[in-house]
Amino acid sequence: MDPINHLNPIEQNLCNKADLAGIPIAGNIELLPLCNMDCKMCFAKMTRSQMEAHSPMHTYQEWIDIAGQASEAGTIFMLLTGGEPFLYPDLEKLYYGMKRMGYVLSINTNGTLIDAETADWLAEDPPRRLNITLYGSSDETYRNLCGNPHGFSQVMNAVEQLKKRDISIKFNCSLTPYNIHDLEDIYRLSQELEIPIDIGYYMFPPVRSNNIGNVQYRLTAMEAAKARYRIEELRYGAAFDDYVAYSLKKYREYEQTEPYKAGYTCRSGNSVYWINYDGTLSACSFTTDCFVNVFDCGFKTAWDTVYNHVKNSQMPLECHNCKMRILCGYCAASAISENGSIHKVPRYYCDLTRYYICWTAN
C-alpha cells in the first residue's frame, strides 16, 4: 500500500528527507476488515462475527484522535483503506475531519459502492487520488474471482461518476490465475479511459490467514515472470526493446559495492507505516514481526518502537549480495510472508526474477 504515490518534486524531496530522519511522513489506516466482495486471494477480509470476536471497529473519535497524534509526529500523507472503506459508517465525517487537519488524503476502494451521492461529497474537497482495484474486464471475471456478478459494471459506473466530477482516479490490478486472461483488456481499458494503472504480477501470501507461503490463489513464479514481461511490453510499447537492453545491461554490469547494514530496504518502517483496524501499528500491511497498538500507548510510542525494530532488523545477506537484486522486487514483507521470517530468502521471488531474466535475455 502506497500513500505517497503521485508526488510533486517538492513532496518527493520531503519524503526523501523523512526517510533519512525517521519521520513518519505517510501512513495507511485500515478502517475495517469488512468487504462487500469475497475475493479468493484477499489477505484482509473478515466476517462481522470474526471482527467482533477479535476487535470491534474503532469510532470516528478514536481515529480522529490518532490522526491528530500522527499529524503532530509529522504525518502529511494518509491512505484510508479496508476492507472496503466505503462500508465504514463515518467515512465522510472522518475524511473531512482529517482534511481540516491538513492531511493529503487518498482512498483505496473496490469502487463498487460509489454512486452519484458518494461522488458528490468526495467532489467537495477531492482526495489526492482515489485508487480503484480493478479485478478484471468483465462481470464474469468479477463473478469468478470476487463473487460479485455485477462488479465490473458497478466499477464502470463509479468511474463515470468520478470522472464527471474531475476526481483523480488510479487503477490498481493484481494478477491471479482467475484474471490473467484479462490482462490485455485491463490495460486497454485504462488507456481508453485515460486512467493510470499499476498492474502487479507478485501476490503476497495471505499472512493474516496463517497461510505463509500459500500459492493457491496466485501465479506460479514462471507465470508471474511471464506476466511481468508482458506488462512491461504493454507499458513501454515501441520503447520496450530499448528498456530490455538497458535492464539487461544494468544486470550484467551490477556489482554490490555497498556494505551490508541492518534495516528494511524500502520506506516501510522508515517513514511509512500501516495501522490495522484494531489499532496495531506495523511497518507494512504484510509485516508481522512487530506490532504496537496506538490505542494502548499512543501514536508516537508505537511509531518509535516499530522504527527502532526496523532499523535493527537483519534481512538476508544472500539477498544483499545477489546479482539479481538490481531487477528483483524483494523486500522485508516478501521474506516474512513467504517464510514467516525476515531472515530467510524469499525463494519464490528468486525464481520469479530468474525466469524474468531468461525471458528478457531470449
Regions inferred by a protein language model and the residue ranges of each:
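Cysteine-centered iron-sulfur cluster-binding motifs in ferredoxin-type domains/subunits
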Residues: 30-38, 269, 319-326
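Short loop/turn motifs at secondary-structure junctions
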Residues: 38, 74, 126, 167-168, ...
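Residue-level signal for the nucleotide or nucleotide-sugar donor/cofactor binding architecture
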Residues: 58, 89, 150, 178-181, ...
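Radical SAM enzyme [4Fe-4S]-AdoMet core and its adjacent flexible, acidic
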Residues: 124, 133-135, 140-268, 274-282, ...
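Conserved alpha-helical substructure of the radical SAM core
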Residues: 1-129, 227
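Flexible mid-to-C-terminal extensions adjoining Fe-S/redox cofactors in radical SAM and related proteins
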Residues: 2-18, 23, 260-263, 280-281, ...
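Short glycine-enriched, charge-decorated loop/helix-capping segments at active-site entrances
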Residues: 48-57, 144-150, 214, 337
